[in-house]
């Protein structure tokens, strides 16, 4: 089989060219921009770092707790501003009871008593308690019955 020298030269030139174009690099998502804006705002308020805080707990109305294991706290008392930075974990109150008890004061004894009663009754604890009687109007379904037939 004879080889045509013109076609061979053309193929060698084509092989030297780059095929596919330039690779586009993926952009990295940086959360540092938000942190720098926050730090700039706190710098304008002359916030100082509070070193004595090891952990922080924020109680939500639904009975959950935002728990910061390692927390950074900055405070600007003259502007009534505190900033908590870190990675929160959403936990149930019952998971944190042994750690929370020494931190709670006398004003929270009523909440603790209600929580203990709910745990003893076998219910899941909820801080609100406003939806306790809402399930009384809902009928129980029995196997084989349709929803419309139950009164």
From Swiss-Prot:
Part of the nascent polypeptide-associated complex (NAC), consisting of EGD2 and EGD1. NAC associates with ribosomes via EGD1. The gene is EGD1. Its main location: cytoplasm. Component of the nascent polypeptide-associated complex (NAC), a dynamic component of the ribosomal exit tunnel, protecting the emerging polypeptides from interaction with other cytoplasmic proteins to ensure appropriate nascent protein targeting. The NAC complex also promotes mitochondrial protein import by enhancing productive ribosome interactions with the outer mitochondrial membrane and blocks the inappropriate interaction of ribosomes translating non-secretory nascent polypeptides with translocation sites in the membrane of the endoplasmic reticulum. It is found in: Cytoplasm; Nucleus. PANTHER family: TRANSCRIPTION FACTOR BTF3 FAMILY MEMBER. GO terms for cellular component: cytoplasm; nucleus. It comes from Meyerozyma guilliermondii (strain ATCC 6260 / CBS 566 / DSM 6381 / JCM 1539 / NBRC 10279 / NRRL Y-324). This is Nascent polypeptide-associated complex subunit beta. One of its GO terms (biological process) is protein transport. Keywords: Cytoplasm, Nucleus, Protein transport, Repressor, Transcription, Transcription regulation, Transport. Residues 32-97 form the NAC-A/B domain. Belongs to the NAC-beta family. Residues 122-151 are annotated as: Disordered.
């Amino acid at each position: 089989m004879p080889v045509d020298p013109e076609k061979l030269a053309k193929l060698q030139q084509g092989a030297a060219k780059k095929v596919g174009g330039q690779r586009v690099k993926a952009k990295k998502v940086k959360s540092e921009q938000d942190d720098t804006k926050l730090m700039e705002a706190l710098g304008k308020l002359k916030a100082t770092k509070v070193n004595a805080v090891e952990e922080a707990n924020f109680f939500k109305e639904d009975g959950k707790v935002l728990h910061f294991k390692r927390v950074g706290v900055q405070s600007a008392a003259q502007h009534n501003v505190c900033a908590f930075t870190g990675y929160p974990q959403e936990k149930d109150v019952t998971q944190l009871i042994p750690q929370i008890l020494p931190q709670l004061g006398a004003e929270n004894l009523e909440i603790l008593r209600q929580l203990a009663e709910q745990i003893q009754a076998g219910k899941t604890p909820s801080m609100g308690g406003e939806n306790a009687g809402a399930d009384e109007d809902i009928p129980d379904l029995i196997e084989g019955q349709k929803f419309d037939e139950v009164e």
